């Protein structure tokens, strides 16, 4: 139980606490457990509105759904192909992906509502050398959960995960898609050219994101990072409406780190470091070359309603680079941004 008396908003007094009494909409991620019958099972917690704290405890799992692991899941082990995983998904199975690195010759394609893809350990998905699309493609269906996975770019692909193939009017109010505890890395693994156009693309409406770490690598194996080596335009692109994201970490991308075009978006806590390594100002100009730098958080000019809370944006620049704005949003009454800060930590650049 959260002691709300211990926390108070204090930014108006020079403090650094942002307190939000309840979470507007959330679902905890599924987890593995052993039932009273000795069988492995997966519990999918229920969707919560205006909730506070974790929805389960040691003595009470709370509301939700229990799924038998062996009957309802396919347990993925290293060496299993993307083609075979997709056959299991088509057959109606969920996936529990065990620790290992999985080079995917084709995207894992989720077409059935309420499908779960759950990783344990450092289950890592890699779009293969001949897979220029993505690691996971989720169709615009209700209730899908993607949780506890690492996505690693070793070659070239459009995205690392894509939810919805395009923007539509379809809503998922009662049973939204959940993406939780997902980690994304572009570069750093091997000394070779790596490219992803945009790491995470959300086109469906009502998506819930709970903890993303999206990282264009700034260090790793020698020869694996550099402005022309590991290239990516955007970390996160949100085109869907009514998307809510909690705990967003997004760093070092070469254009807008986060680019939000959907209406009624909400973001709770954002940490972002701009790229270290732009060679010169001419490489880092937005708005068709008319504005110095790229905003770390950009809400498109046509958006009318957006809310965001508790942002920390900073830079460590190797070269003399100017960034005009760390955040860019439309000047409209429906745009509300609370508790924003930025800072230049060190390096040759100025902000």
Task: Please tell me what each predicted stretch does.
Residues 1-351:
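Extracellular/periplasmic carbohydrate-active domains that bind, remodel
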């Amino acid at each position: 139980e959260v002691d709300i008396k211990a926390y108070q908003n204090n930014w108006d007094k020079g403090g650094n606490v942002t307190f939000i009494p309840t979470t507007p909409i959330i679902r905890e991620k599924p987890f593995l457990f052993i039932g009273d019958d000795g069988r492995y099972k997966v519990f999918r917690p229920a969707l919560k509105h205006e909730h506070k704290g974790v929805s389960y405890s040691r003595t009470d799992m709370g509301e939700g759904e229990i799924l038998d692991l062996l009957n309802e899941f396919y347990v993925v082990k290293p060496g299993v192909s993307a083609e075979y995983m997709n056959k299991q998904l088509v057959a109606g199975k969920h996936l529990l992906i065990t620790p290992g690195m999985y080079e995917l010759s084709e995207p894992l394609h989720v077409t059935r509502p309420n499908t779960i893809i759950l990783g344990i350990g450092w289950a890592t998905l890699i779009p293969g050398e001949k897979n220029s699309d993505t690691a996971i493609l989720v169709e615009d269906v209700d209730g899908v959960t993607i949780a506890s996975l690492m996505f690693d770019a070793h070659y070239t692909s459009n995205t690392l995960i894509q939810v919805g193939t395009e923007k539509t009017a379809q809503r998922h109010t009662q049973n939204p898609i959940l993406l939780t505890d997902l980690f994304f890395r572009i570069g750093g693994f091997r000394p070779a050219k790596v490219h992803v156009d945009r790491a995470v693309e959300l086109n469906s409406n009502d998506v819930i994101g709970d903890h993303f770490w999206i990282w264009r690598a700034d260090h790793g194996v020698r020869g694996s990072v550099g402005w022309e080596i590991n290239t990516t335009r955007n970390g996160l692109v949100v085109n869907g409406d009514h998307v809510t994201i909690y705990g967003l970490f997004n760093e070092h991308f070469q254009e807008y780190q986060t680019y939000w075009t959907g209406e009624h978006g909400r973001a709770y806590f954002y940490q972002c470091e701009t790229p270290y390594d732009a060679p010169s100002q001419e490489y880092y100009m937005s708005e068709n070359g008319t504005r110095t730098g790229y905003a770390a958080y950009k809400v498109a000019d046509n958006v009318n309603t957006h809310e965001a809370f508790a942002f920390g944006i900073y830079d460590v620049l190797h070269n003399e680079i100017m960034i005009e704005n760390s955040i860019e949003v439309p000047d409209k009454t429906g745009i509300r941004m609370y508790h924003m800060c930025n800072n230049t930590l060190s390096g040759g650049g100025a902000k």
